[in-house]
Amino acid sequence: MNKIKKFLNKFYLDRNEKEFIRHNKKIFIPKPNRSKPLVLMELNESSANLISYSYMASILEKKYDATIFSFIPNVPRSFFKKSMWELRRIFGYKTLRIFKSFGTDRLIIPSLSGPMKIEVNDIFQKKISFIKTKDDLENLTIFGILFGDLIYDYYLNYYKEPEIDLSSKKFRQHLRFCIGLIVFWNSYIKNNDVKAISVSHTVYSNAIPSRIANNYDLPSYQTTVEDIFLLTKDRLFAFTEFKDFRSVFQNLPANIKRQGISKAKE
């Protein structure tokens, strides 16, 4: 009964959500046009981030004169899960309704075409033979892009296991699944006029679209309730501003440097 209630709650807006949608419709007046370039926004259910998502989407839409598409990063792992996402799209999943209120025009649910499945199998057969150690996995590249760290961490997170057995059937299935995501997003970003992308995380499978966007020199962002991070080929992760501290410190006035060093010694 609780599971049914939880599922139904995904379709019904509470008072605050309704108010937020009214606010968005007053503030944001998008003009979707599918002949325009695209900005992709990951459909994320984190309530705390939705306000920043709405303003970020509006800024990117205006900057690139683009249409906003939302997306889920993963290919649904079963027919049932894919059906659930289709039902959410058709009957008004509440998070999707919130996204539509600030301008998203379509929800992308990844799926693999016949040629994509052949490509996935070819890549899998080539890569699996080279993965002998966990370091091999962590350093795995596909299309010249580093994905091994994402595949590794996503396995541990998804299966809630402390380590990977590289010889297991479960790992082989997981690797094939992740290659499917990579093939889909590489094809989508390569063959559509995508101008920018916003993701919820820079780890796990969520980061696959951003890594591919970076490879095509497209701006990608992690948008949170407090921060927005620009991701690049050289800066794959959010929260890495500490790497700039030395250069920032060197550009400070001498008296500020002295005060800071003195304070640090206390």
Go through the PLM ranges and name each one.
Residues 46-47, 59-69, 193, 216-218:
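Short, solvent-exposed loop/edge-beta patches enriched in aromatic
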Residues 48-49, 139, 143, 205:
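Secondary-structure boundary/capping motif
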Residues 46, 175, 198-200:
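A generic secondary-structure micro-motif detector
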Residues 54, 175-186:
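Short, well-ordered alpha-helical scaffold segments within catalytic/effector domains
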Residues 1-42, 59, 63-179, 225-266:
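Conserved N-terminal ligand/cofactor-binding loop architecture of enzyme catalytic domains
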